[in-house]
Amino acid sequence: MIIDRIEEQERYYPLHPDMELAFAFLAEAPDLEPGRYELENGLFATVSEGDTRQMDTVSLEAHKKYIDLQYCIAGGERMSWAHIQELNATTDDPEHDNYFYTGTSTSVSIRPGMFYVMFPSDGHKAACHHEFQKHYRKVCLLYTSPSP
């Protein structure tokens, strides 16, 4: 898992061949309408806005085929993370590359200008809150994880 500010993006370009392409899309995202966007090399992104969900009502999820990069454009959210080896698997949806878990996780506040990257070993909850609901605008970008 990576959490950082968008200004630090260049340090992550060497991690994946499509990382620079992903960040280039994020530069355009604040002006885009909500919806799904198809990019080069099989990357796709969803620009969305809404209200955060109560943290304890959301399951942890992970993806086996994709790396998940999420960027907060406006508002804010809390996200939660745990390594999947420390979690209990509950439901698999391989058709949509979603795998759900329960267990203890660590949460952090995500503010505008911050991004986080979740790898296949990272269980996560996104767009959540503990006490007070917030409105957010964000981008979720998925790109293929290199084969192990």
Cite the ranges covered by each PLM segment.
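Conserved small/polar residues in nucleotide/adenosyl-binding loops
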Residues: 143-148
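Short beta-strand His + acidic residue motifs that chelate non-heme Fe in jelly-roll/DSBH
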Residues: 79-80, 108, 124-131
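Surface/interface-facing alpha-helical segments and adjacent flexible terminal/loop regions used
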Residues: 1-34, 38-39
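Non-DNA-binding regulatory cores of transcription-related proteins
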Residues: 91-103
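Conserved metal-binding segment of the jelly-roll/cupin
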Residues: 110-123
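Conserved short histidine dyad/triad with adjacent acidic residue
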Residues: 46-61, 78, 82-86
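Glycine- and acidic-residue-biased ligand/ion/polar-headgroup-sensing regions
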Residues: 67, 71-77, 94-97
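His/acidic/aromatic-lined binding-pocket segments of jelly-roll/cupin-type domains
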Residues: 67-71, 107-108, 115
